[in-house]
From Swiss-Prot:
The chain crosses the membrane at residues 642-662. The gene is Egfr. It is found in: Membrane. The lineage of its organism: Eukaryota, Metazoa, Ecdysozoa, Arthropoda, Hexapoda. This is Epidermal growth factor receptor. Glycans are attached at N31, N224, N263, N323, N342, N600, N605. The keyword Oxidoreductase does not apply.
Amino acid sequence: MYNNYNLCHIRTINWEEIITGPSAMYSYVYNFTSPERACTPCDKSCEQGCWGEGPENCQKYSKTNCSPQCWQGRCFGPNPRECCHLFCAGGCTGPKQSDCIACKNFFDDGVCTQECPPMQKYNPTTYSWEPNPDGKYAYGATCVRRCPEHLLKDNGACVRSCPPKKKALNGECVPCDGPCPKTCKGVEKVHSGNIDSFKDCTIIEGSITILDQSFQGFQHVYRNFSFGKRYEKMHPDKLEVFSTLKEITGFLNIQGDHKDFKNLSYFRNLEVIGGRTLTEYFASLYVVKTSLVSFGLSSLKKIYSGSIAILENKNLCYAQSINWTRIKKSSEHESLLSNNRNESECIKDGLVCDEQCSDEGCWGPGPAQCLSCKNFILGNDCLQDCTAPGIYQADEKTCKVCHEECDGSCIGPNTDHCKKCKHARDGPFCVPECPASKYNDNGVCKSCHGNCVGGCEGPENNIGPNGCHSCDKAILNDHVPEGCLQKKESCPDGYYYEWVSPLEQGPLKPLASKAVCRKCHSRCKKCTGYGFHEHVCQECTKYKRGEQCEDECPADYFADANKLCIPCFSECRGCFGPGPNQCYKCRNYKIYIDEDTDGNTTSFNCTETCTPEYPHKIFNPDSEPYCSLETAGLIENELQPAILAGVAVFALAFLVVAAIIMYFWRVRAKAKENTVKMTMALTGLDDNEPLRPTGVKPNLAKLRIIKEEEMRKGGILGYGAFGNVYKGVWVPEGENVKIPVAIKVLHDGTGANTSKEFLDEAYIMASVEHPNLLQLLAVCMTSQMMLVTQLMPLGCLLDFVRRFKDKIGSKALLNWCTQIARGMAYLEERRLVHRDLAARNVLVQTPNCVKITDFGLAKLLDINEEQYKAAGGKMPIKWLALECIQHRVFTHKSDVWAFGVTIWEVLTYGGRPYENVPARNVPELLEKGERLPQPAICTIDVYMIMIKCWMLDAESRPSFKELAEDFAKMSRDPGRYLAIKGDKYMRLPSYTLQDEKEMIRNLASAMDGPEALVDADEYLQPKSRAPIPPGLSASSTSGSPPNTPVKPCWPNGKPLAADSPTPQNQQNWDRELLRYGANHRNGNVSSHEPGNSAQHGHYTPPNGHCGHVVGSDSTASRYCSDPLKMIDVRDCDVTDDCFDGEVNSAHQQAQVGNLKLDLPLDEDDYLMPSPQLPTNTTQYMDLIGDSKPTEMEPKRVNNGYRKYPEFLTIQGKTSLDNPEYIMSQDEGPLTPQTIGIPTPDLEKVLTNGTFGSQVRQRSSEEESDHEYYNDFDRLERELQPLKPLRKNETTV
């Protein structure tokens, strides 16, 4: 409001009462220089503001003064039940719809409604809509029975004009059949300037002309040669505006040429050409020199006047096939068709009518362009028959589409002709949705319950998902509707009537402004409101006390026959009547009527004090106090002496019996002790301490004590809390070797407890012996105590996976997991708890072999202990189980938790567990169920194993034996369990034997001496590779092997199997020869039983690398399936450790004939080439004969391995690297032996010939690093004549 000088009282109005909504805003501006006009105050009767003088102009309130129950509405008073109906606007005078001052929606005969009564209503009997006699039209906000004459009727409303797609017909708006009629004027020619004026036209008064200029554009020139408007180019698709055109009163002139102007489908709905005006040749259809290929005038039915001229259209087909007389109404005009495309060319290009068209021709290709159909017609399409889904046969030649509510076929056009309904079936009719009085039950409309109002969702007489939308009256139970009633039906017993607020929200919103029956209080049987006072409770369910209903009478009341609670006598504690002699118990004293105080049925009176008749108060502990004629002392004095005498006699008897029993027990125990002492003295076992054997096997591990001068310390490797770790060399006293070691030195000045823990670590390390556990070599007991262990050149596994992340594949990762699990399983078997397992405490010996170390926190459990409880000290929180952190309890299962974290570190390539979480917060996270996330490369199979390791219940975690088996199984198919990009191209960093030797040399470079460099494993477990002397028998092999140490692993970490019969392990090759010689000489064992022949040798193989005895005499250890089958790595169990057991031995052995071949494989099970032969020496048959003798090659020494002379070159004999070649023959078998076993008798070979002499003359410097399985100097195989092949192929 702006600058209203004469306006009074406007500032007194409360505008919040009037305007509503978020955009409501009141603004008052007064900019005059003179002060505002002084107005008279409002009348004293006004609450706040007024619109003028007098009480009649006071502002009335119906919003700001309402109760909260009337929220979002108005009211006629401040009380909760004085809310206006929701259909009211601006206030009301009562709660009904007829009490509104104004209506929010519609006003219908004095009542405010949501909408006007509909003009149609549903008849459930006929399943159809019928006119509603009470229907009204909406005229503005008023419901009227008839619309004013100047307005139209549309969908129950009075409108000024029809909406789109409807037309006025007899005062009503009806849907148009297709486009709604629109008449437009014709033009001289169509161009880009006027094309849009034809939009939605159905009739053109005049003609249509389309020329070349229509598409190419042109400059308009007036008759006085002045220039008009320039019209741009137009694409033929702009002619789509003519798709609604049905009639042209003049002619249709087409002379346009454009590459995209192929047909006249833009006029596809054109039905009539009037021909009121004609063009050249008196034509009403004139098509000359166009680029048309077909017409596309599929709806053209009549040309009333004029001829038809189709001329000079070089691409036009179909014109000759059309029966033009059927279209022309006038017979006076001819049809001119000339110089169009040759009909034979059209046929050649397939531009002919569809087979469903009749002989009258067509407008273009397809069944929709026929003038008439050969069989049936459906709309504009010609069909073979009317059997397709969704159509039916209307007459002999016509098919029609089923009603849109039909799902599939039908027999007629209406909704009751459908065989199946698309949405729902209401009686015989298909409907898009069920009417309001019915619900959809699996496609069938069924009637709602009779009490439902506004529709339903199911048959139940209730408001809910399977019942009514609303009802006139509902029965409530705990604020939830449980049934509906008719509007005039009364509430059942136990319920009371209540009115629901019109602004109700929640489950009662469908019942707003309606009546409900609420359940009475549980104590009331009939009521008028909620409560259990007689004001609202008409009848009690159980008992009534005073003015209230009760579930039961109180303790000091009793119920009469009418269930009324009546008070007991004042001295009673519970009663069954009102008198003093009807009490269950008394508050003070009883007075027995018949003096029988012990009977339960004895009657008594209750009294506050004893009466003069019964003056004495008796307090009996077994009963209530009562009044008596006699005093209590007389009764007690009579009984007291007898009671005391009985107690004394019983106590004396008990003491005598107890003393006798103790005496005899002591005598027997003394006699038994003397008997034991005498027996021990007689047997010589007199000892003061009794024996308590545990059955535990003795620990026979050896602890080697060395001197300080045997140690050579080098650079420092790491720091610890109690000492430092140095790399160094150990030179054992009296031996000519140097061993690279790691030396852990205790700090000076450490306490006695630290030294004890240092020795405890030494004890545990010396007690373990496993290929995946770092073993103690020796202890130096100087002032600074030293622990000597094997040197792990590649550092810890944590740094290794971080450094070589891009080179580590899935197989290596799973092998490491398996090895760690096997090492921990060994500790579990020996009752050792590690307590500090982590990736930093796993050392890498080779890329294929890891070892667990750092036993500083490890504890050995006694035979009767299942757990260790730490007293204090630091703990690696993020690696520990929850019970370790909270209770300091350590078991093997807590090591399993740490194993899961260690595996997580490895599979995340050195990730930090709980990296951004302080250690003190880790226990809380674990209790809440949080665990380390799944590594990116890890499948759910591996992650589930980690989750099992992190179970809060320790007993639910797997054992290390189970973990080792699981990871061993996964390592045989690594790509299935770890998804690493480029996995098959990854190779671990090379760490060959030469690298290790070089490391040892560098380490000992400062300590030069004559000692030989030896690895710790070789020093502890040496192996012999001495050649076999001639004539040596099986019984002569019992001597000890020489001291020359041999590295028992291939450079890639694969060990040499101890029972291999190939020269790749010289010791076992010698043993095979000895077995064969002994068996051949004695004739005890067939050469076809290599598994059994090994049992006759007396040579005991030394332990394999890492401490396991390798080799087996059983056939199962040699083969994984058929012994005559070439073994594939998938058929065998693939080893994943750094030592060879039976599995590894089996999976590397191939079989040719009866001979096992131990072939060197790399980490991916590919055959490794031997480094023995020089690159310029062929390994195949010399067909040219210009190869040089191998004896001329210089003999080489490589890494300390023996070197044998190369193969002899004998004239006519050629070295051959294919062992099967000499086995194929057609002149009978050479010998029952396979390759690798000499054809002549072994004794002859060993005693004379080239073999024996060469063996005696060889030195260790001449021995080779690797030998092939067809070493000639051992077998003299080249001296055997080559036989022709038995078959024309080579068997592999």
